[in-house]
């Protein structure tokens, strides 16, 4: 790390991440479809997601991100106005706000691509968080939970099914508690309960 290093704003980091992961997914999905004799266009939509500036998450950041920092680096980040949390035995990490998604800015483009029978990759990483200001959009220093944005996209596209891919074997409720439980397939009513 260079002393003159300037970190990019969170919204720019989200856009960059969405772009490079979307590019990779798009190419790999396209190749797999071609290998199976399926000729469909695969498109990645750089996606902004509107969040509420008064969402309680902006007042209580909880989403841990970035690498572990030592005490000196953590103090420098605090001086820059960033929120830092200590993880005992591991070091310090930055925490940011994780507001709920309100709406997807590019939803009409996503729907048009779906209507054109394209494979669409959208809302990567939860989307680029933006605030609406008199019909203008401004990037927000936050991240959006991917699962919540996936649900919002399913809702706004009238999806018949929502499948969330994860690297964990099962989704859990009451994680870390005595009543922790693995979930497999669940109904909408069960999901609303949790």
Q: What are these language model-derived features?
A:
Residues 2-12, 132-140, 187-194:
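Glycine/charged-rich beta-loop-alpha catalytic/anionic-binding loops adjacent to active sites
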Residues 2-120:
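Ligand-binding beta-strand-loop-alpha-helix segment within the catalytic cores
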Residues 3, 104, 119-166, 174:
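Conserved mixed alpha/beta catalytic, RNA-binding, or beta-rich assembly cores of soluble enzyme
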Residues 7, 93, 102, 111, ...:
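Generic secondary-structure boundary/loop-capping signal
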Residues 11-14, 70-75, 147-152, 190-194:
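Short, surface-exposed, polar/charged, turn-prone segments marking secondary-structure boundaries
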Residues 46-53, 125-128, 168-170:
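Glycine-rich beta-alpha junction loops
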Residues 53-60, 132-135, 173-178:
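Short acidic, glycine/serine/threonine-rich loops at helix termini
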Residues 158-194:
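Glycine-rich phosphate/nucleotide-binding loop
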């Amino acid at each position: 790390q260079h002393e003159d290093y300037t970190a990019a704003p969170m919204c720019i980091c989200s856009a960059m991440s969405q772009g490079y992961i979307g590019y990779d997914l798009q190419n790999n999905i396209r190749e797999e479809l071609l290998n199976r004799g399926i000729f469909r266009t695969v498109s990645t939509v750089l996606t902004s997601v509107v969040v509420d500036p008064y969402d309680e998450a902006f007042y209580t950041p909880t989403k841990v991100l970035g690498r572990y920092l030592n005490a000196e680096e953590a103090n420098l980040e605090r001086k820059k106005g960033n929120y830092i949390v200590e993880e005992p035995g591991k070091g310090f990490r930055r925490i940011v706000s994780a507001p709920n998604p309100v709406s997807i800015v590019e939803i009409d483009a996503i729907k048009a691509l779906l209507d054109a029978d394209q494979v669409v990759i959208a809302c990567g990483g939860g989307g680029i968080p933006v605030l609406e200001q008199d019909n203008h959009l401004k990037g927000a220093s936050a991240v959006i939970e991917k699962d919540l944005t996936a649900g919002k996209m399913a809702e706004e596209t009238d999806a018949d099914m929502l499948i969330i891919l994860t690297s964990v074997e099962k989704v859990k409720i009451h994680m870390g508690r005595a009543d922790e439980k693995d979930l497999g397939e669940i109904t909408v009513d069960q999901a609303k309960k949790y």
